[in-house]
């Protein structure tokens, strides 16, 4: 069984304190695939309740680019997410306002790198208390994007719809994400304002540990365009410590390989 909170989101077993990720592209030379330079990707720090409290992000050169912090109240409800550059300058922030029961009533996002852009979100809930809509809008009141959530009769999230609005507030794109009973994404697709498919659909498969093992994308004619297959090495806890990602396009035979390493430290 997985733990609660962010341990479950990352399919982590055991009381993980740190998760360090490194990545390496593989190059094909002399009849075999060999790793190129390995570089750090990101690091997650969890508190003893299994919630992410700090995140380090690294750029393509392996240099630290962002430092993230997440803060919670005494009951574990999220209150603030901040990302700063290595010098301490603010890059972005998310401020959460909740009611007495911990239900989110408003969220304010500030993008501080480049032009300062502020957006607010006010979610809407059904009678059972489940979030059914989240509308984001700019300071002048124009709409930015809207999320719509649909649930199974048993209560699990079944589908998330994302509508992105153009400058005239017409729908520019619609993204559909479908989930299985375990909360795993099993299908994604993107449609233009006329309802035509412009990305995907892509289907996903998982192993018994909740790790993604395959992603298959169809082209606009319905044929198979590409596949991405994932294989894993596991530690004694059942957590993956190495993931090999193999991407192939069907028509051209183009192939890329990426290895991701995950070093875990436990409480």
Give the predicted meaning of each segment.
Residues 1-267:
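Buried hydrophobic residues that stabilize the cores of well-folded domains
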């Amino acid at each position: 069984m997985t733990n609660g909170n962010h341990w479950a989101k990352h399919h982590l077993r055991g009381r993980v304190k740190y998760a360090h990720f490194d990545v390496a592209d593989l190059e094909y030379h002399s009849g075999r695939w060999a790793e190129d330079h390995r570089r750090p990707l990101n690091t997650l720090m969890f508190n003893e309740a299994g919630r992410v409290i700090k995140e380090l992000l690294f750029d393509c050169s392996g240099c630290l680019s962002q430092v993230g912090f997440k803060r919670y109240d005494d009951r574990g409800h999220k209150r603030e997410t901040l990302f700063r550059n290595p010098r301490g300058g603010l890059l972005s922030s998310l401020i959460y306002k909740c009611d007495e029961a911990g239900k989110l009533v408003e969220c304010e996002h500030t993008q501080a790198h480049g032009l300062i852009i502020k957006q607010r979100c006010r979610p809407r809930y059904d009678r059972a208390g489940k979030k059914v809509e989240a509308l984001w809008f700019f300071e002048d009141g124009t709409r930015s994007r809207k999320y719509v959530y649909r649930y199974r009769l048993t209560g699990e999230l079944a589908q998330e719809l994302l509508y992105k609005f153009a400058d005239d507030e017409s729908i520019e794109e619609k993204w559909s994400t479908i989930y299985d009973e375990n909360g795993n994404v099993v299908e994604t697709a993107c449609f233009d304002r006329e309802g035509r498919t412009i990305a995907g659909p892509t289907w996903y498969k998982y192993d018994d540990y909740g790790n993604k093992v395959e992603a298959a994308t169809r082209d606009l004619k319905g044929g198979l365009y590409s596949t991405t297959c994932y294989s894993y090495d596991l530690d004694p806890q059942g957590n993956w410590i190495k993931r090999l990602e193999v991407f192939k396009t069907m028509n051209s035979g183009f192939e890329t390989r990426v290895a991701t390493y995950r070093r875990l430290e436990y409480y």
